[in-house]
Amino acid sequence: MNDLKPATSYRSTSLHDAVKLRLDEPSSFSQTVPPQTIPEFFKESCEKYSDLPALVWETPGSGNDGWTTLTFGEYQERVEQAALMLLSVGVEERSSVGILAFNCPEWFFAEFGALRAGAVVAGVYPSNSAEAVHHVLATGESSVCVVDDAQQMAKLRAIKERLPRLKAVIQLHGPFEAFVDHEPGYFSWQKLQEQTFSSELKEELLARESRIRANECAMLIFTSGTVGMPKAVMLSHDNLVFDTKSAAAHMQDIQVGKESFVSYLPLSHVAAQIFDVFLGLSHAGCVTFADKDALKGTLIKTFRKARPTKMFGVPRVFEKLQERLVAAEAKARPYSRLLLARARAAVAEHQTTLMAGKSPSIYGNAKYWLACRVVKPIREMIGVDNCRVFFTGGAPTSEELKQFFLGLDIALGECYGMSETSGAITLNVDISNLYSAGQACEGVTLKIHEPDCNGQGEILMRGRLVFMGYLGLPDKTEETVKEDGWLHSGDLGYIDPKGNLIISGRLKELIITAGGENIPPVHIEELIKKELPCVSNVLLIGDHRKYLTVLLSLKTKCDAKTGIPLDALREETIEWLRDLDIHETRLSELLNIPADLQLPNDTAALAATLEITAKPKLLEAIEEGIKRANKYAISNAQKVQKFALIAHEFSVATGELGPTLKIRRNIVHAKYAKVIERLYK
């Protein structure tokens, strides 16, 4: 058992101060998991599973058919070399190592190398601007930064003079500018990797490792706030190891040495850290790296190679898979489409029966068996035929999306967590309510704070996975984690009779109308999306207003490289319009706006939005869809009265979506303020 560093509080806002651990929690699981540092956890796993495959990545022209596989034993060797490399360029204890790169094996090597050297890991989204990168490195007191390529190195060149603690920048992949490996402080990963390090440096590494304690900070996760610069969430070694073991214990059907994962979501996000980096260590799972264009269309290629057994994705990832499947289905013959529709209905019916705790009839089982033979080739086509568990989280998942995949024998189990809880605190594994976030993981205590007459209130949680604090922000830390250990999530929810957590929305997103009605927007937004399959994004407006309105964007294709929305409509939008006897295939034709908005030009997008004159049939159909959604409103105050169309789909590239593909509500409000004001005149 790792000795703990003396601490006086359960909270900390400094990289140099440890925290007390809640080892006396009533959970029996918590008492069976001793505190452990991440290097100890890593070493234990690598030695236990030394001959099993750990990491796989594409290396065109080399390896086995263009792919390289690393065993856990080799993984451990690479991490030791990375730790020595970081020491050689001056990484300081209790400083951070910034990692500004797309998912790749070197990300993992740098992470565990930094931790072994007594440093803290601070991931940076590759999409961040130079100023946003500066914020992470300055806040995190970085002494070393690892960057992906020349494009990311250019950001560091622009800001390095303003980072006096930053001693070294290491570039992972070429091509390299002339200054790399020649100017002081700039290195290539390859050259450092080729070095042989002295026995003195190796002794220094062991000495540093021996000083690490489980109750010290191991990682900084920067929350993607909508107001101001992101806050740095401090996670301890114990936070991350405990959350990993808690999630693993909650999952079913784990087969040691036979699990396969695909790493494609940003590793600067806590969900990817737990699912990609740490879960594989807990039961010898093999991680295959997708390329940097995974979310722009190449992910299926990696799935076909890796055949993952467990998958985690934000809803937008599953929406992209759905789009591919819908487009492929549209090209099939009418008889094939009819057969597939009936098969999907039979599979969904069978799954729904099981979730309700009922036993299917003999006829139902036979129908399901036959239907599975029809949908299996589709699962094979997208590389998920071996996948037994599908998790989604990070944003609300629509009922329509869940039903679509349920028909393919894919039950999307929602999970719930935050950066501040070190990852997942609930997992919907043994699904009894498809529309819930499942039940609390082992060692987690949940409660609903000040519930209303429907049992709904703020979700609170406590346990060893509650974060240390926000770096340098004691007031914000005290607002979030109270002295009694309860973390106030800011999320609204309730617990159903079966113990499942149902998420209603965010307290901060709660709309309070001029009449004083409290309205969580997500539920209403999802109802409208269900009624209008042509719509990609819905944003409810109404705070301090007399009535509710919505901004809507229609589904269009996007540029595979830049992620910028295109003028061409998606196949499902075209089909929906065809039923209205509208035959346009481009958004500009449909809304009578310019075809090239020069995105991400906000000025042009706003001007086009203000001048939209859409087809009357389209406006009528949208109005009817909103009326259908309004039938489910629990009061007149929750009915949507007006809507406005936006001139392009929301995206990360144009700023309306954050890195985890959540709508950035404040930004959309500001960008389209003139459009919103027109809805209230």
UniProtKB/Swiss-Prot annotation:
Coiled coil: none annotated. It catalyses: a long-chain fatty acid + ATP + CoA = a long-chain fatty acyl-CoA + AMP + diphosphate. It is an enzyme of class 6 (ligase). GO terms for molecular function: ATP binding; long-chain fatty acid-CoA ligase activity. Pfam families: AMP-binding, AMP-binding_C_3. ATP binds at residues 223-231, 414-419, 491, 506, 639. The keyword Ribosomal protein does not apply. InterPro entries: AMP-dep_synth/lig_dom, ANL_N_sf. PANTHER family: AMP-DEPENDENT SYNTHETASE_LIGASE DOMAIN-CONTAINING PROTEIN, LONG-CHAIN-FATTY-ACID--COA LIGASE. Mediates activation of long-chain fatty acids for both synthesis of cellular lipids, and degradation via beta-oxidation. Probably by regulating lipid storage and catabolism, plays a role in neuronal function. Belongs to the ATP-dependent AMP-binding enzyme family. Bubblegum subfamily. This is Long-chain-fatty-acid--CoA ligase heimdall. It comes from Drosophila melanogaster (Fruit fly).
